[in-house]
Amino acid sequence: MAWQRPDGRLPYELRPISFYPSFTRFAPGSVLARCGDTQVLCTVSVNKGVPKFLEGTGKGWLTAEYRMLPSATQKRQERELLKLSGRTQEIQRLIGRSLRAAVDFEALGERTLTVDADVLQADAGTRTTAITGSFVALAHAISKLLQEGVLERSPLCGQVAAVSVGLLEAEPFLDLNYIEDVAATVDFNVVMDQHLGIIEVQGTAEEGSFSRTQLDQLLDVAQKGIQELLIAQREAIADWESLFVIN
């Protein structure tokens, strides 16, 4: 029997996605990203200076941190204080790698952009929502730096969005919620740029294996969702046309 989605969505349908820019006061870029019941607060801060391996090169850097509010899930989780879990470290590296694909670091100069993605509520897809929302926050931060004259030209040279896909009852589904994520026999996180080029694919089978045909189906479904997310991102960035130097 075919999988029936708990929220009534079609197999290739995204959850409702929305961005609330300028959500906090002090960070140059801040966005509350909502994907269904998943909510992630994404902020971008800017500091002079770069890691030692970049000093004197004239190039900037972008790094990311990811955390979950203890009450983001149904059962309260302990705060990660002295040591980060392997999952947290993996996710924040993924966010950083993904967003670095959209930045011209020579245009940024010797400055460091720090992305903070804090999950307020989790219903699966937190890392993909963090990437998609953090890109919007990054664009707003760059816009502010340009307006203030800190930067002479925009270092944004690309656009990045991410989505989850999975196999349920051997069929591909887009943007899994928690119930679906638990039930999926295969689940993927896919990150793409504005040309639908692949930045990263994370995919595993929870039991057994999956075929090359199913892999292609999952990537096709992910591409469809990312096309919609790219449009939603642009609609949340008022000065899109002047801000981006897209190759």
Swiss-Prot record:
Reactions this protein catalyses: tRNA(n+1) + phosphate = tRNA(n) + a ribonucleoside 5'-diphosphate
Enzyme class per UniProt: transferase
Keywords: Nucleotidyltransferase, RNA-binding, rRNA processing, Transferase, tRNA processing, tRNA-binding
InterPro entries membership: ExoRNase_PH_dom1, ExoRNase_PH_dom2, ExoRNase_PH_dom2_sf, PNPase/RNase_PH_dom_sf, Ribosomal_Su5_D2-typ_SF, RNase_PH, RNase_PH_bac-type, RNase_PH_CS
MF (Gene Ontology): 3'-5'-RNA exonuclease activity; tRNA binding; tRNA nucleotidyltransferase activity
Binding site for phosphate: R87, G125, T126, R127
EC number(s) recorded for this UniProt protein: 2.7.7.56
GO BP of this protein: rRNA catabolic process; rRNA processing; tRNA processing
CDD domains: RNase_PH_bact
NCBIfam families, per the entry: RNasePH
Function: Phosphorolytic 3'-5' exoribonuclease that plays an important role in tRNA 3'-end maturation. Removes nucleotide residues following the 3'-CCA terminus of tRNAs; can also add nucleotides to the ends of RNA molecules by using nucleoside diphosphates as substrates, but this may not be physiologically important. Probably plays a role in initiation of 16S rRNA degradation (leading to ribosome degradation) during starvation.
Family as reported in the entry's similarity comment: Belongs to the RNase PH family.
Oligomer status and interactors: Homohexameric ring arranged as a trimer of dimers.
Protein name: Ribonuclease PH
Organism: Nostoc punctiforme (strain ATCC 29133 / PCC 73102)
